[in-house]
Amino acid sequence: MNQGILLAAGFSRRFGSNKLLQPITDGAPLAVVAARRLRAVLPEILAVVNPHDAVLARLLEQNDIPITVCPHAQKGMGASLAWAVSRTPQASAWIIALADMPLIQPATIARIAGALCDPTAIAVPVFQGRRGHPVGFGRAYFEELAQLNGDHGAQSLLRHHAERVQRLVCNDPGIVMDIDTPADLDSTPLN
């Protein structure tokens, strides 16, 4: 079973307030929209949140999004990803999405998931030559994912296993559009 991981444990330092709570589509918060898009394709998803964000945790749970609280989220994206992966050891693959990227099309998520039949597969979407999210990892990478740390997520795995990375060209600008500042939010097509 493919496991969706929604990384929602950041601290929104560049935004100035909790960007993941900002309303976008029909008033739904950014993180909820991103989670819904992931869930549209993957029945099993898990959102990882930081221990200081009870409001986001509650909001996700109210929208039937399972959460896990990463006690050391301040160590960075890698630590949060490792925490979530270690909580889902039964998965056959992990599709890792970012909660500040609500524009990814479900068809792109499905394509990434479909490329992970081989346990050694790694899949990344590419739009106009730019690699984006979500990123998918087959079962063979469980140990490496579960030991990540720092603020660069799974970048080291993508470099170390470059020969295994499938670059899936897609017509989805959402894979490279994240919301880091209020200006990014204002220019989001969903607003």
Can you name each region flagged by the protein language model?
Residues 23-24, 136-137, 178-180:
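Short beta-strand-to-turn element immediately C-terminal to the catalytic PLP-Schiff-base lysine
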Residues 55-58, 144, 178, 187:
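Phosphate- and divalent-cation-binding pockets in alpha/beta enzyme and binding domains
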Residues 130-131, 135-161:
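Short, glycine-/small-residue-rich phosphate/pyrophosphate-handling segment
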Residues 1-131, 139, 163-170:
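Nucleotide and nucleotide-moiety/phosphate-recognizing core
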Residues 15, 105, 145-146, 189:
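Activation segment
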Residues 101, 133-134, 146, 167, ...:
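A residue-level structural signature of the nucleotidyltransferase/glycosyltransferase Rossmann-like core
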